[in-house]
Amino acid sequence: MSVTDKFKQFLVNIKVQNDAQIELRYGEITAALNKEFRDSESKTANNLQVGSYGRWTAIKGVSDLDMLYIVPSSQWDKYKDGGQYALLDRTKKAMKDRYPRTEVFVDRLVVRVLYKDFHVEVQPVFELTDNSFRYPDSYNGGSWKNTKPRAEIAAMTEFVGEKNKNLRRLCKMARAWKNKHGVGMGGLLIDTLAHNFLRD
């Protein structure tokens, strides 16, 4: 077996195995929140998968998943002045009402939904005109912060095309190494270092 074939097999071995289950959970969460905020049960509208899974750099055994739920802009006035925790709590209750046996709780910036094999961190957000998002931080009385995941995902996708998909491959291999050796390094840092390495 050539070195190329060994790397190909390595990437097959670390590929996410439970995509269908992950997508099912994302859909369930989205439907619960669409029902609460929009009286709709769409499993796909108004969410954005972020984190390593959203950037396509996750590997087999991924245990923490991240998503944004885009709250209708009509709700902004209700929460803008000190309503950060209230928005997170409403998000939690909507999921808890729909799935009462699942552990769901507010954790400062997100609502954590704990499933048997992985957990999902759900962040309710308001979309801004520049395609960024405003999200609640419930710490110390509450504040609003901004994030630009669409720009990050677009930059990753563009760079992946320029580098013949090697960026995502390198990110996945680095994650496997990190997991194997217990290195304390976050996924975004891995992706950033891999991006910078291939860029330079």
Go through each PLM region and give its residues.
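Generic non-transmembrane alpha-helical segments
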Residues: E28-S40, R90-R98, M173, W177
